[in-house]
């Protein structure tokens, strides 16, 4: 029973049920079991002996409407174009924070609609597909917004700051927090929240765990699960 609860989606906030919610379920069922025993009606066996540490809590995720709300607060300025690329890279392509920050122009394979992640976890590289929306946003940013931010400077990195330098990973995180606030999204979590969200949405859409594993760059299927 608790295996079911630990994997049940949170209908209101996305992700899984919180530890406190699971604990409340456990306490209520324990009290009900004691009532049955006091009335000599038997015992309810639902795995009440399971410890909190044994209950797997799913990561929090954004809903699809949350993602669209993020897009809606972005304008057509150079920084707005960069915002769309931020969302496309971390949600649309499911990259880790360090992977997205390390992307360079040479890592965008336009003819194949792929990103080359050369600095993945544990030094592993991989190719990640870009859907049409992400490819269009990246192309527009590279041809327009990025050039405006750069001025006469030369930088190899994809993400450029408003001063024309390489945008720091902390700045990417801070900007995502600002976008969430503008969109009225209260969910906590940084850029990894977008990675969890796309993985969950792919699963809900019928994508196999094996494909999602390769998409995310996980070494084992257990990590994806």
What is the predicted function of each stretch?
Residues 1-225:
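Conserved catalytic core of the tyrosine transesterase superfamily
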């Amino acid at each position: 029973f608790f295996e079911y609860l630990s994997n049940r989606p949170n209908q209101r906030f996305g992700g899984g049920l919180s530890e406190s919610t699971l604990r409340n379920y456990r306490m209520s069922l324990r009290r009900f079991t004691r009532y049955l025993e006091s009335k000599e009606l038997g015992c309810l066996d639902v795995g009440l002996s399971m410890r909190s540490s044994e209950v797997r809590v799913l990561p929090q995720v954004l809903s699809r409407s949350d993602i669209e709300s993020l897009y809606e607060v972005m304008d057509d300025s150079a920084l707005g174009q960069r915002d769309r690329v931020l969302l496309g890279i971390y949600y649309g392509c499911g990259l880790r924070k360090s992977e997205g920050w390390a992307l360079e122009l040479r890592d965008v394979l336009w003819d194949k609609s792929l990103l080359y992640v050369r600095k993945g976890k544990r030094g592993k590289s991989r190719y990640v597909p870009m859907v049409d929306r992400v490819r269009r946003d990246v192309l527009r940013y590279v041809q327009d917004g990025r050039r405006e931010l750069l001025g006469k400077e030369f930088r190899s990195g994809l993400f450029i700051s408003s001063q024309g330098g390489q945008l720091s990973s902390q700045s990417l995180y801070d900007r995502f927090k600002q976008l969430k606030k503008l969109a009225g999204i209260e969910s906590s979590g940084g850029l990894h929240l977008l990675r969890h969200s796309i993985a969950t949405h792919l699963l809900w859409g019928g994508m196999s765990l094996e494909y999602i594993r390769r998409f995310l760059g996980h070494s084992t299927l257990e990590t994806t699960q």
